Design a protein with these regions (language model features):
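Conserved mixed alpha/beta catalytic, RNA-binding, or beta-rich assembly cores of soluble enzyme
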Residues: 1-24, 37-146, 150, 220-222
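Cofactor- and metal-binding active-site motifs of prokaryotic enzymes
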Residues: 1, 8-19, 25-37, 59, ...
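C-terminal non-catalytic interaction/assembly regions of soluble proteins
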Residues: 117-124, 134-197, 201-217, 224-229
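A generic local secondary-structure boundary/capping motif
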Residues: 29-37, 68-70, 92-96, 195-196, ...
Length: 229
């Protein structure tokens, strides 16, 4: 109701903006508080992660700040991006996260690895680096793993599209990768997870190869943008 009111009053509406840009709203209660502040004539603080391209003019209802800026102790803040950036403890600042699907997971695993082990390691990596699971757009690996039961089960559970590439395609990936002679002997390419993430649309690697219990994971981010027009 409140977000509809912002639209009817020709003010910037967070839910419409999120829908247009395919952003996940992490907390609808905070979204309503943002809309209430805007209806009351207040400017809402907002920040966007540097990887994002901004299209159009920033609406007057928002005041953009840098992540390092100090906020009013009672302020609401919008954070647009894939990573958690909580306000300092005790600051009183509440953060509404708007999350794009811009993360690509590169995954490698030993044959027969259980889905639970894959899920456990992916979850640990995302949590360690503060990356929202809702930001994951797809997972990628080498074509040798196209029908790997554990990988397929994990992706199906979280409704994550799964894409695979031949070793020749992986070899063409541009960038600096964490090579392994053992992996090259096994798969024909020196690195599966990082190269897969880049081949699947990654613009840059956020998390290089991490390995645990036979599972390797890398995280890349695509180019992404938000449109205020």
């Amino acid at each position: 109701v409140i977000t509809t009111a912002t639209d009817l009053n020709q003010k910037w509406a967070v839910d419409i903006f999120a829908k247009k840009n395919r952003l996940y709203i992490e907390d609808m209660k905070l979204a309503k508080l943002v809309s209430a502040d805007i209806l009351a004539g207040k400017q809402v603080l907002a920040e966007i992660e540097p990887e994002c391209s901004v299209i159009g003019q920033i609406p007057k209802e928002l005041k953009f700040i840098h992540e390092s800026d100090r906020c009013d102790s009672r302020a609401l803040k919008i954070h647009i991006g894939i990573c958690k950036n909580d306000a300092p403890a005790g600051s009183g600042t509440q953060v509404l996260y708007l999350i794009p699907k811009a993360v690509v997971l590169g995954i490698g695993c030993k044959k027969g690895t259980a889905a639970e082990k894959i899920e456990k390691h992916v979850t640990q990596v995302l949590e360690e680096y503060g990356i929202f699971p809702e930001a994951v757009k797809l997972a990628a690996s080498i074509d040798l793993k196209k029908e790997e039961p554990g990988l397929c089960t994990y992706c199906e559970k979280y409704d994550i599209p799964f894409q695979t590439f031949s070793k020749e395609e992986l070899e063409q990936a541009e960038g600096t990768f964490t090579g392994s002679e053992f992996v090259k002997q096994t798969t024909g390419v020196d690195n599966v997870c990082e190269r897969s993430a880049m081949c699947a649309g990654g613009e840059k690697i956020l998390v290089h190869k991490t390995a645990h219990e036979g599972v390797t994971v890398a995280v890349a981010v695509e180019k992404w943008s938000v449109d205020f027009e």
